[in-house]
Amino acid sequence: MTLSPDVIDGLPYVEGVLNYLTPMAERPINLAYDLPPGVPRSTGVPEAHRVTIYNVRPVATRLSLDSEGLALVTHNSAVRDFYDEDELQRVYYPEAERLVAEVTGATRVLVFDHTVRRRVWGGVDRSAGTPRQPVTAVHNDYTVKSGPQRVRDLMGEEAEELLSHRFEIVNVWRAIRGPLRDAPLAVCDATTVAFTDFVPSKRSGRRSP
């Protein structure tokens, strides 16, 4: 169900500044490895825009992955320490699999990765001894090419059979503590984004020779 403008206009909101990509001729490159201090991790240049960010909690039941590309659900976890890697994989992975299956109706769910982000002022993301930092740029994680490739990377001989059916890559996010005042998560209603607005980027996981 797509939310009407009248419904959206009636929601609580805040104004915020988000970093979009400055238009550029070449494809941006993101570097996912340790770099010397001061070296940017992306060739893309951020362009700040002030936008309206709505609180969709009052209409959470009207949102869906199939329409808006997002779902807001309540979930109680048995995890006691989200900074404990073993507990995350032992307890939270099965919880997340059950949650995604319930929300999507999927017959099979595989959790293949997780990231715990915690703001450290002055910390550099992906640097030794620093937890992963909040992402400060508007972005999408997968393209029509990299999504199926992720399935091939993970599923081996099963991949082509699985790709002959419908599949989704779903991000599950939650606050470890709240309320969040520093870097709360914002997501975009997919019905408001044109496919032509997406800019594919290249991700480099190792230093070139």
Q: Would you name each region that the model predicts?
A:
Residues 3-209:
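Non-heme Fe(II) oxygenase catalytic core, chiefly the N-lobe of the double-stranded beta-helix
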